[in-house]
Amino acid sequence: PDEAPEARFVKAPEMGRQDRTEISWSISDDYGVSALELRITLQTPNPAAPDEADHVAVPLSGAAPTSAEDITQLDLTRHRWAGMPVTLRLVATDGAGQTGLSEPVDFKLPEKLFLDPIARVAQEVRVTVLREPRDYAELAKNEDALRQDALNVTASNRLGTAPPDIQKAALMLDAMTYKGERYIRDQGVYLTFRTAKGILDAAATKDEAEQVDPLLWALALRAEYGSAADALRRLEAARRALEQALRDGASEDEIKQRMEA
């Protein structure tokens, strides 16, 4: 019979360079492993979602290797649970859909340290939204919903159907921008916060509310690092392109093209 694939940590995950988490792993399967993921769960789960788990892809070298061992550097500082104690497990999947899990390992996800007040607020609002596991309540049905004024009322009441932490994030943004044009010197910062507030006001689902994620993350980086944040993002994109090219066995010319893209 075809056995489930095996996955294990070669050694405990640890902090690597530039805030990356270093994962040393080993996998094996008679017919090849088609995918490898890192499963992340909270050590102290949210009572509203006790079984909540996130999965982060771990790149494999080659197609469906029957045996492999490698060290992968993952940037988990943007993860919604950054800075929190979690439990990590490797999940290997073979072509038949069978999965094999490694032993669990306790770990504290690294977080990016923000010192700038604007950056800290942006990050706090961001994770408050992302860590909310509860869904939106359904809007009450309105017999006159076809009337435009009824539609407007419904839209304005959307935030009232949001789960508690998303409502809290909206209040934080309101407090941050109350007469903010007087004391927030950078107009772009003020407008970004107001845009994020508008997104939360209009959202009717968790996915829509989470659209504030890239907006507030970019704002936090820019507030903390200034124009260097753009350079850091370009450098990180180049690093990822190089790693992928090496995994794909690209030629020197192909590597150069990917790095210049």
Q: What is the predicted function of each stretch?
A:
Residues P1-A261:
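Extracytoplasmic/secretory ectodomains and luminal regions
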